[in-house]
Amino acid sequence: MNYKENTLCYEEYCKLRESVGWINFSRTQTEKSLQNSLYTVAAEEDNQVVGMGRLIGDGMYYMIVDIVVQPAYQQMGIGSKILNMIIEYVDSATPDGGRSSIQLIAEKGKETFYESRGFKIIPHEFCGSGMRKVIRK
């Protein structure tokens, strides 16, 4: 398995989302989002992208989005490797004496995957519930 940084393209992105039943966004919106990502990881096997993850943020607050592994390749450590690479990126970008916060929205049923890697379900002792608003046109 090869892991490539910052090479994720529109076609690979859409194919991976479709492989897990996620709806794709418009090409224009997706290409802009990929360009504006701080960091992307693509897992490649036999010249085929089988997993991905993206990081967005501002240098203090980060959000992990689009962690996807094709179903046939799940339970092989690919998602863990992608997540670890993203966390390492944030760690290396955090200055000495600084602090960074990483958020994500786990797919239902995948919460324990993230909990086992140090993420906490919110609300907890320091945070209220996470929220989101979707705008459709």
Stretches with model-predicted labels:
Residues 1-27:
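Short amphipathic alpha-helix that is part of the acyltransferase structural core
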Residues 8-11, 59, 108-112:
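Short alpha-helical
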Residues 17-44:
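Active-site rim helix/loop that mediates acceptor-substrate recognition in acyltransferases
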Residues 38-40, 80, 87, 131-137:
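Accessory recognition modules or surfaces
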Residues 42, 48-56, 61-63, 68:
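Conserved beta-strand in the GNAT
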Residues 69, 75-89:
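Conserved acetyl-CoA-binding loop-helix of GNAT-fold acetyltransferases
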